[in-house]
Regions:
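Short, basic, low-complexity termini and linkers enriched in Ser/Thr/Gly/Pro
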Residues: 1-18
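Charged, compositionally biased N-terminal leader segments and the immediate start
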Residues: 16-40
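Alpha-helix C-capping/helix-to-loop hinge sites
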Residues: 31-38, 58, 168-171, 459
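Short acidic-aromatic active-site loops that bind/stabilize oxyanions
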Residues: 177, 363-364
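Charged catalytic cores and adjacent phosphate/nucleic-acid-binding surfaces used
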Residues: 209-362, 368-382, 386-388, 393-423, ...
Length: 592
């Protein structure tokens, strides 16, 4: 589904080529949205959503392959029809099916999908009942109190719609970290190839691994006479040049993302990197420390009077105020400076610390690959164990497993573990937490598993007290290991459920349960604040991908970024343990 910051709203025009994988995925997502609004076959809709996910997670650029005359690789869930559409999108920036759907539906109706809580079915309901075709139509209907009268809406939903429309007007556009990361990586590699460029760093909120990014700040050190600025504004993804100068230029990409490039002399590179990495609050706090020592700190360096005393490296900037280097993810003025002064900075977890992944799906439900394929991909990613955790029966849209199918999968995993080398597959389930807090599968079945991952997939609008009680009851279950994506949010599409997270963490600690930090770029849930709270409460966090394809293991880097923002060290993360260390920790959650 399209959400704020998704590039789909910007790519649907043949002039916007070359096309990247994210653009192809966005076209497929919009086709799926429009088909769902029209009420078409859910299997066809799912095929487009699955194809979008597969393409977006692919490490190779499909347009470049096609341009080079290569055949499209065989992709899970992408048959000849979808492959043909990929080639068409790469050539034209759109496809005939999308153009036809746009002709059949009001042109601005997909804008409604950007309002949190409005999925295609609700958009269709609004259109059928109230002829709502635009955000302005929606604002008027909500203001007149007409939406509350529709089935499935009510006063609370109407109020949230009004709030979302108001927030949408006030908030600047932001891009999910993974989307911004695609542009950042491409730009960084392209700029690095410009003659005379010696160093390139993407700074800003992207370097701090914030879950959404407003713009990209790129710093460059280059030899005199380097054509880097001319090349930058001529980059083929540039839609408009906002400013151009000898040391600073700004452009807006065709996706809508603004990128600022600064040419920095070597003696100032560290100071500029610190300054433009931010956050603003962190920089202010560091400058105050400098002022107390008679120093002036800015993007050009550290000065005592007119004399530069530091600034070529970030370490020299921090050292000037008697601080060790502080990792970028911690720089939010949330106690990192005080911790550094006390010598108590955490040693944030690294991607290499992870030994396994405790949440993934396969073709048995809504994944794209077999258990064997997922296990081998995890092994290739450097992991030594994975847990297969399919959806349970209540989640019919994902073809969730009933007890019989789950028992059959348990036998399959046992057979596979006898054949695989270098990777172990754990038997799990992502069981739905029902509205009353009970679990979707009986204990007689759950007891056969290595771990149980529980998740909220429905009744998101319960009041705080009831939603919290629901999760607390689930944590009391006889078999319960990890609370998955605890806030149940989807960035830009669904707000977090209203719960008392501190109460949940304390209950998890008391009952010996764990919480997940879901690394999917659409989720990143736990957020950084709650991840840090988990650390402070002594609750271990599982950084897991929620992988639905072999490509999804690349998302671990985003989960690690969020974990670092939450001050998590390797010891704070459940799946940094070896399998031998992990098994007793899982067994305790299963009543063994």
């Amino acid at each position: 589904m399209m959400v704020p910051g998704h590039p789909s709203a910007f790519i649907l025009h043949p002039s916007l080529v070359p096309v990247h994988n994210a653009d192809i995925a966005a076209v497929f997502e919009e086709i799926a949205d429009l088909l769902e609004i029209k009420g078409e076959n859910p299997f066809r809709i799912r095929a487009y959503r699955n194809a979008a996910r597969t393409v977006s997670e692919l490490g190779r650029d499909l347009a470049a392959l096609i341009e080079g005359g290569a055949e499209l690789p065989k992709l899970p869930g992408v048959g000849s029809d979808l492959a043909g559409k990929i080639r068409e999108i790469c050539a034209r920036g759109t496809c005939a099916l999308l153009e036809r759907l746009h002709r059949e539906l009001p042109p601005a109706i997909t804008e409604l999908l950007r309002i949190p809580g409005l999925g295609p079915k609700r958009v269709r309901g609004l259109y059928d009942a109230l002829r709502v075709k635009t955000i302005e139509d929606l604002r008027r209907a909500a203001g007149a109190g007409r939406i509350r009268e529709l089935p499935g809406f009510g006063e609370k939903m109407e109020a949230r719609i009004r709030e979302a429309i108001a927030a949408r007007k006030a908030a600047p556009q932001r891009f999910k970290l993974a989307i911004a990361g695609q542009y950042a990586a491409a730009l960084e590699a392209w700029i690095a190839r410009v003659p005379g460029v010696r160093k390139v760093t993407v700074a800003g909120s992207y370097r701090r691994m914030r879950e959404t990014v407003g713009d990209l700040d790129i710093l460059v050190a280059a030899a005199a006479g380097s054509p880097v600025m001319k090349r930058f504004v001529a980059y083929d993804e540039v839609k408009s040049v906002l400013a151009q100068g000898e040391t600073r230029s700004s452009v807006r990409l065709k996706s809508g993302l603004q990128v600022d490039l600064r040419l920095v002399p070597p003696e100032s590179y560290g100071a500029a990197l610190h300054y433009f990495t931010g956050s603003k609050a962190h920089n202010i706090a560091v400058r105050k420390l400098g002022q107390a020592k008679g120093l002036k700190i800015n993007e050009y360096g550290v000065f005592r009077g007119e004399a530069r005393v530091a600034g070529d490296t970030e370490e020299s900037v921090f050292g000037a105020v008697d601080l060790p280097w502080i990792p970028p993810e911690l720089r939010e003025d949330r106690g990192e400076i005080e911790a550094a002064q006390r010598g108590e900075l955490p040693r944030p977890i690294e991607l290499a610390d992870l030994k396994g992944d405790l949440h993934l799906h396969t073709k048995a439900t809504d994944g794209h690959n077999t258990i064997r394929e997922m296990a081998l991909a995890a092994k290739a990613a450097g992991l030594s164990y994975v847990a297969v955790t399919e959806h349970s029966r209540k989640l019919t849209v994902a073809r969730g497993l009933d007890p019989q199918r789950l028992l059959k999968q348990i036998d399959e995993i046992d057979r596979l573990n006898g054949e695989l080398a270098g990777i172990t597959v754990l038997k799990g389930i992502e069981v739905d937490i029902l509205e009353d807090g009970s679990l979707d599968l009986p204990d007689t079945v759950l007891s056969r598993l290595d771990l149980v991952v529980g998740a909220v997939h429905s009744a998101f609008d319960l009041p705080r007290r009831k939603q919290t009680a629901r999760i607390l009851r689930a944590l009391d279950s006889r078999h319960f290991t990890i609370l998955a994506h605890p806030a149940a949010r989807l960035l830009g599409a669904r707000a977090a459920i209203d719960v008392d997270m501190l109460a949940i963490l304390r209950a998890a600690k008391k009952r010996g349960r764990y919480l997940e930090l879901n690394a999917q770029p659409d989720r990143l849930d736990l957020d950084d604040v709650n991840a840090r709270m988990a650390r402070e409460e002594g609750v271990l966090v599982a950084v897991s991908t929620d992988a639905h394809s072999t490509f999804d293991f690349s998302h671990l880097k985003y989960g690690i970024g969020q974990a670092r923002r939450g001050w998590l060290e390797a010891k704070d993360v459940l799946n940094t343990r070896s399998l031998k260390e992990l098994r007793p920790l899982l067994a305790r959650t299963m009543g063994r």
